[in-house]
Every structure is written in structure tokens, then in C-alpha cells.
Design a protein with these regions (language model features):
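Sec-dependent N-terminal signal peptides
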Residues: 1-2
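C-terminal motif of bacterial Sec signal peptides marking the signal peptidase cleavage site
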Residues: 6-10
């Protein structure tokens, strides 16, 4: 996985040092995760279900408060992510994500539906930010960068990519 180097801001606030290098059993780049989390040092991944070959769900919390919800499914039927987002009330201002053929970025939400291995079934990655959409809309680019970085590694961990 490529590591993105990010400089410390002028304020000297580099919270990426407090972020573990794995979230939900998936190796991540802390610098891509940092903008999505509130300030705080106590970053924890709390599995909501045991990671299995076809399903994983966890919550990333900071200071005991949920910040991100990450859910992965494999072995799913494919569907159009943008059509799904337009039909679901949870997606605010959905648009096609860059760099992933069937993915949507919205205010505080990302979903991607991609092939799972060589079979006809699909992998679904669904990420929700636990913050008001008015705040999350300013973090769309950061959420998209995190999610597109997480996606291929998550697919390997869940068994879609060998």
C-alpha cells in the first residue's frame, strides 16, 4: 500500500500520530484517516461483528464517541451505487466517486460496489461518518481518498482478492 506523506499543519496539530495503522482489521494510512476523525488521542476500533469471510462491521471511535462506521460485504449481487444513493435518504448530495467505477461519495457517506474476485458476486464497502452533514460536506475529498485507499486492502482481508 502506498503511503502518503502529509506535512504538519501550521498549527502543529498532527493527530495522525494517535491513529493506529490498522482499523477494522485493515492496514490503513493514518494520514488519510486523520481528517475524518475528531481531535483526541484515544482512537479505537470496535468490531460490531466478528470479521468473517463475507461480512465485517466495525465502529471507529475517538474518546469513546463513534466517529466512523465501516461495513463490508462480499458475495453480494451487484447494483448501481449512484441509483441506490439517489433512492436512499441517508445520502446527501450523492455523486460518482473518482477512481472507482461503481462508487458514490456523499456528505459523510461513501459506498462502492466492486467485483469480488473472479466470480460474479460483488464486494460492498459502506462508510459513514458520524457527524452532521453540514460538517461532513467539507470533508468529501478526504473521505473519498480514505475510502479508495481502504477499498483494495479491505477486499483482500475479506477474501475477495487473493
Amino acid at each position: 500500500m502506498a503511503v502518503l506523506a502529509v506535512g504538519v499543519s501550521a498549527c502543529g496539530n498532527d493527530k495522525s500520530n494517535a491513529i493506529p495503522e490498522q482499523l477494522c482489521g485493515v492496514a490503513i494510512t493514518p494520514e488519510l484517516t486523520a481528517p475524518l476523525l475528531p481531535d483526541g488521542d484515544d482512537v479505537k476500533t470496535e468490531p460490531q461483528s466478528p470479521r468473517k469471510d463475507e461480512y465485517a462491521q466495525c465502529t471507529v471511535s475517538v474518546g469513546g464517541k463513534a466517529a466512523l462506521y465501516i461495513v463490508e460485504y462480499s458475495g453480494q449481487n451487484s447494483f448501481d451505487a449512484l441509483e441506490h444513493a439517489r433512492d436512499a435518504s441517508a445520502f446527501r448530495n450523492p455523486q460518482k466517486a473518482k477512481g472507482v467505477t461503481n462508487a458514490v461519495i456523499a456528505d459523510g457517506k461513501f459506498i462502492a460496489v466492486t467485483p469480488c474476485g473472479e466470480g460474479k458476486k460483488s464486494h460492498v464497502l459502506d462508510i459513514d461518518m458520524n457527524m452532521p452533514s453540514s460538517e461532513a460536506m467539507d470533508l468529501r475529498d478526504e473521505l473519498e481518498r480514505f475510502a479508495t485507499s481502504y477499498l483494495p486492502v479491505g477486499k483482500k482481508v475479506i477474501g475477495c482478492e487473493k
